[in-house]
């Protein structure tokens, strides 16, 4: 059951990432069609921007994310010895280098991992998690975060964040060009027949709906990786109850104050406790706690 879940979530992640990349290139093509009379130029611009953003994000993601979430680094075991030794132990079991350890001063219990790869990774927990979780529960949480590092989820999350930023930038460029009178000549489109009109309408819709689709893809990726990290974390501790109890405590707590909204998908549980009505699950950064607990209990 465990290995089935891991394999299934890895496949879903591949599909979501392919869709994400195709969306970036499609929006680039729409931008090229609408404002440059050449879809290939738009695709090339989108690809170059995506590559630049990904390199920038990957090279400095840890420091950027930690600053955004007001986290401060623990240099040794003197401040939080239990936390330090649990991270050390779980990293050893997971066969990864010891990640950097950070604390976020927030009363709400939560945690996240970030970085580029296992050699350049970091784990952050809130002061609230240290106050409310026992050792067994904290081990479950840290094992979950170590699994994110081991499975390269941290890199995937960084890439998804960069691609979402590129989509937002491309759409902003298109909006500004449209506002200042750029774009295709309507007479040319009418002379080109129905095909050109359809392409024009589709391109405009893609520019409008692109950021929405990017957000849905980013959240879908996050949800899949949470299931995978839950399963992989239990593989490290051999104790699903520790993570189950931790998730239940975290889900019943108050929203965080220190978390940055753009980093919400990184946390083990939604730091803002967002839960909406019809269709809102598409924009949830995490699967429902009830479903995660059920899967853990079925292992």
Swiss-Prot record:
It comes from the Bacteria. GO terms for cellular component: plasma membrane. One of its GO terms (biological process) is proteolysis. The active site is at residue 145. The keyword Endoplasmic reticulum does not apply. It is an enzyme of class 3 (hydrolase). Belongs to the peptidase M48B family. Zn(2+) binds at residues 144, 148, 226. Its EC number is 3.4.24.-. This is Protease HtpX homolog. It is a multi-pass membrane protein. Its main location: membrane. GO terms for molecular function: metalloendopeptidase activity; zinc ion binding. The gene is htpX. Keywords: Cell membrane, Hydrolase, Membrane, Metal-binding, Metalloprotease, Protease, Transmembrane, Transmembrane helix, Zinc. Its cofactor is Zn(2+). PANTHER family: PROTEASE HTPX. It is found in: Cell membrane. NCBIfam families: PRK04897.1. Binds 1 zinc ion per subunit. The chain crosses the membrane at residues 16-36, 39-59, 159-179, 197-217.
């Amino acid at each position: 059951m465990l290995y089935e879940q891991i394999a299934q979530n890895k496949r879903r992640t591949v599909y979501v990432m392919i869709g994400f990349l195709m969306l970036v290139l499609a929006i680039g093509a729409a931008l090229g069609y609408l404002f440059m009379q050449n879809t290939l130029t738009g695709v090339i611009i989108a690809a170059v921007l995506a590559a630049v953003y990904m390199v920038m994000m990957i090279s400095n993601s840890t420091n950027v994310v930690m600053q955004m979430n007001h986290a401060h680094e623990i240099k040794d075991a003197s401040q939080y010895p239990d936390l330090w030794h649990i991270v050390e132990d779980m990293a050893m079991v997971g066969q990864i280098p010891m990640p950097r350890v950070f604390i976020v001063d927030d009363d709400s219990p939560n945690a996240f991992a970030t970085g580029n790869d296992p050699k350049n990774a970091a784990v952050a927990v809130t002061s609230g998690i240290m106050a409310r979780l026992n050792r067994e529960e904290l081990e479950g949480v840290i094992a979950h975060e170590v699994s994110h590092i081991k499975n390269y989820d941290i890199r995937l999350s960084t890439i998804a964040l960069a691609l979402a930023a590129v989509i937002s930038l491309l759409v902003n460029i298109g909006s500004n060009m449209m506002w200042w009178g750029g774009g295709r000549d309507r007479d040319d489109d009418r002379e080109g027949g129905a095909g050109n009109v359809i392409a024009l309408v589709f391109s405009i819709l893609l520019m409008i709906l692109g950021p929405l689709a990017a957000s849905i893809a980013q959240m879908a990726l996050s949800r899949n990786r949470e299931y995978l990290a839950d399963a992989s974390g239990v593989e490290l501790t051999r104790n699903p109850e520790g993570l189950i109890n931790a998730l239940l405590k975290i889900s019943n707590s108050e929203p965080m104050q220190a978390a940055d909204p753009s980093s919400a998908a990184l946390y083990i549980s939604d730091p803002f406790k967002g839960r909406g009505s019809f269709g809102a699950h598409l924009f949830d950064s995490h699967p429902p706690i009830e479903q995660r607990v059920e899967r853990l209990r079925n292992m």
